[in-house]
C-alpha cells in the first residue's frame, strides 16, 4: 500500500519554504497566503503546527482601519481578518489601479494596515525568525514596503532582535517560483514514505 500524507494547502507552502525555500535552515517561520482568502502556516521547531486542528489565523480579530466601513461576510466574526482582506473595496481598487487609476493606492494602504497588524500579532505570539508572504495579492510587490513601514510603527520597538531590525529579511516574499505548495507536498510525501 502506498502511504499518503495529508495537510492543508498553506501548511504545504510553509513546509515547502522551510525545506527548499527562503526559510530553509530556520527552526521557526510563518507562511501567509494572501489571495482569495487568508491562510497561515506556522513552522515551530522545524515542524508545521498542528494542535487540536490546523491554525485558522484568517479568523483572527483585528482593529478595523478607520476608512474601512465594510461589515464583513463571516457569519462568526464580523471583523475577521479574512473579511477585512476580502472587502470589495480592496478588490475593486486593485483592479482600478491595474487600469491606471489612482484608487489602488488607498486600497493597498488598507490592505497593508491589516497585514502589518496581523504580522505584529504573529511576531508576539509565535516569535518566528522569518515571515513569508505569498498568494496572488502579494504579487503586488509594492505592498512589502508599506507593510514593513506599518509593522515597524505598530511594533514600536517592543521586540528588538536582529531579525526584526532587518525587516527586508524578516518580512519577505515567497520563493520557489511560487511553487512552494507543490514543493511542500513533495516533502510531506517523502516524510510519509519514511514512516
Please describe what each predicted stretch is:
Residues 1-12:
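N-terminal glycine/serine-rich phosphate-binding loop of ATP-dependent small-molecule kinases
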Residues 34-36, 135-136:
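Short secondary-structure boundary segments
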Residues 2, 16-27, 48, 64-195:
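ATP-binding/phosphotransfer module of carbohydrate and carboxylate kinases, centering on a glycine-rich
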Residues 44-45:
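A cytosolic small-molecule/anion-sensing beta-strand core signal
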Residues 55-58:
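A short acidic/small-residue loop/turn micro-motif
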Residues 9, 35, 185:
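Active-site glycine-centered loops adjacent to acidic/histidine catalytic or metal-binding residues
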Residues 5, 29-33, 39:
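Short glycine-aspartate micro-motif
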Amino acid at each position: 500500500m502506498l502511504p499518503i500524507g495529508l495537510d492543508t494547502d498553506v501548511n504545504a507552502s510553509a513546509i515547502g519554504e522551510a525545506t527548499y525555500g527562503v526559510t530553509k535552515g530556520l527552526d521557526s517561520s510563518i507562511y501567509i497566503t494572501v489571495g482569495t482568502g487568508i491562510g497561515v502556516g506556522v513552522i515551530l521547531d522545524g515542524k508545521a503546527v498542528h494542535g487540536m486542528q490546523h491554525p485558522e489565523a484568517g479568523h483572527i480579530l483585528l482593529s478595523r482601519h478607520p476608512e474601512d466601513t465594510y461589515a464583513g461576510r463571516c457569519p462568526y466574526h464580523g471583523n475577521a481578518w479574512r473579511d477585512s482582506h476580502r472587502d470589495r473595496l480592496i478588490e475593486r481598487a486593485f483592479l482600478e489601479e491595474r487600469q491606471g487609476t489612482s484608487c489602488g493606492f488607498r486600497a493597498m494602504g488598507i490592505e497593508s494596515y491589516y497585514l502589518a497588524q496581523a504580522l505584529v500579532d504573529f511576531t508576539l505570539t509565535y516569535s518566528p525568525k522569518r515571515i513569508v508572504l505569498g498568494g496572488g495579492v502579494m504579487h503586488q510587490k509594492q505592498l512589502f514596503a508599506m507593510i514593513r513601514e506599518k509593522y515597524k510603527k505598530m511594533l514600536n520597538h517592543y521586540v528588538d532582535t536582529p531579525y526584526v531590525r532587518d525587516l527586508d529579511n524578516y518580512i519577505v516574499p515567497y520563493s520557489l517560483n511560487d511553487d512552494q505548495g507543490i514543493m511542500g507536498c513533495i516533502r510531506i510525501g517523502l516524510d510519509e514514505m519514511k514512516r
